[in-house]
Design a protein with these regions (language model features):
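FNR/FR-type flavoprotein reductase catalytic core
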Residues: 94-95, 101-167
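Glycine-centered loop/turn positions within well-structured domains
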Residues: 8, 16, 64, 130, ...
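Long, contiguous hydrophobic alpha-helical segments, chiefly transmembrane helices and signal peptides
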Residues: 1, 7-8, 71, 85, ...
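Iron-sulfur (Fe-S) cluster-binding segments and ferredoxin-like electron-carrier domains
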Residues: 1-26
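Ferredoxin-reductase
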Residues: 31-122, 140
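Short, surface-exposed secondary-structure boundary micro-motifs
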Residues: 23-25, 77, 128
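Conserved strand-loop elements at the edges of beta-sheets that form or border functional pockets
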Residues: 12, 89, 136
Length: 167
């Protein structure tokens, strides 16, 4: 799609003022049946599993339904802007979501987690978001290729697939 001037915004760095053209109305509920919502959550169970990787859970104020492979936008109090993180867990109508995060030098959210200042904090949450999901009704072979912390969303997909005895 590069030849059409398209790119993945999640993999881009803005270097100057820019303008985005969205051809038509984007309605997430048309493809997922979900409405992302704002809410708060409590960060808990933080555990460093490697020098630059931590896992933690969020206890959401309200239950959410999300599709395996989706993500939530997270923001610590006083932080400007949200950061997207894929859930590693999968459960329907849940108040619990699990994450694995790699330290990103200069990353406000990840640096706060690794500095230890975020433990047991409240977190602003928006979501669920994303269309890189698993739908077992498609009944197709499932091939997952990932690396690094990109494994998070795939862990959610594999969790659902295993729970359904998909393989």
């Amino acid at each position: 799609k590069r030849e059409k001037g398209e790119c993945l915004l999640c993999q881009s760095t803005v270097l100057a003022d820019c303008e985005f053209l969205v051809p038509g109305k984007l309605v997430l509920t048309e493809t997922t049946g979900q409405n992302p919502l704002h809410q708060s959550a409590r960060l808990k169970g933080m555990q460093t599993v490697a020098p630059d990787v931590t896992v933690f859970q969020l206890e959401l104020d309200k239950p959410i339904d999300f599709m395996a492979g989706q993500y939530l936008l997270l923001r610590l109090p006083g932080m400007e802007g949200y950061r997207p993180y894929s859930m590693t867990s999968f459960a329907a109508n849940t108040r619990q979501a699990s994450f694995v995060i790699k330290r990103s030098p200069g990353g406000r959210f990840s640096e706060a987690l690794f500095a230890g200042g975020a433990a047991e904090h409240r977190v602003d949450v928006f979501g669920p978001m994303g269309l890189a999901t698993f739908d077992p009704r498609e009944n197709r072979d499932l091939v997952c290729l990932v690396g690094g912390s990109g494994i998070a969303g795939i862990m959610s997909i594999l969790s659902q697939a295993v729970s359904l005895d998909y393989f």
